[in-house]
């Protein structure tokens, strides 16, 4: 059967990736223990890249069995593992909180983001009327673990934000054309890594800029419905 062939081919790719991850993990340790931290760092980056690629493969593996409900069960696992928070602030701004920094632009990074953000957005808006912000600012706030200050200097142009913007546009924007939505990027220190995204009417953006300096460490309370 075709489904079985695809299933086994994908499983083979997973096994190959795991083998390469094991090799890279050994290299990370070897270079570190032999005093070559720069090369250990390079190998660690490669290990992380292989890990992301492996995750993408394992996420589609259950569906290739043809089992009913495989996609829904996989989405539930993703939701529990990467608990994305979605809602409206007290001011009426739409917000998404992702419990990680967004990855750099690379092969597979957009698919990785789509795999956890799209199900979270779909679930939040299920049964709710559409919301469309016009003439707004899309603000990306990269919150980095203060124990890792080197992450403060992020190259915002090299971060995979396009997929996030595209998914948000499906639910809260007419589209992401510059005439509709401007973009703003900033970084802040926190107790742990996360990404906060806000959709703010332009006339409210000066207010958000002031409030951004004193946002609580865990983020503001988000509501199921928009009050404003």
Q: What do these predicted ranges mean?
A:
Residues 145-187:
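Short, hydrophobic/π-rich interface segment
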Residues 1-75, 81-83, 89-93:
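N-terminal targeting/trafficking signals and adjacent low-complexity tails
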Residues 91-93, 107-110:
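Long, charged, low-complexity intrinsically disordered regions
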Residues 86-90, 129-134, 189:
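Short glycine/proline-enriched loop/turn "hinge" motifs that connect secondary-structure elements
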Residues 177-225:
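C-terminal edge-of-domain segments
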Residues 111-139, 146-148:
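An N-terminal amphipathic alpha-helical segment
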Residues 83-102, 139-144:
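Short amphipathic
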Residues 60-63, 127, 167-171:
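Amphipathic alpha-helical interaction surfaces
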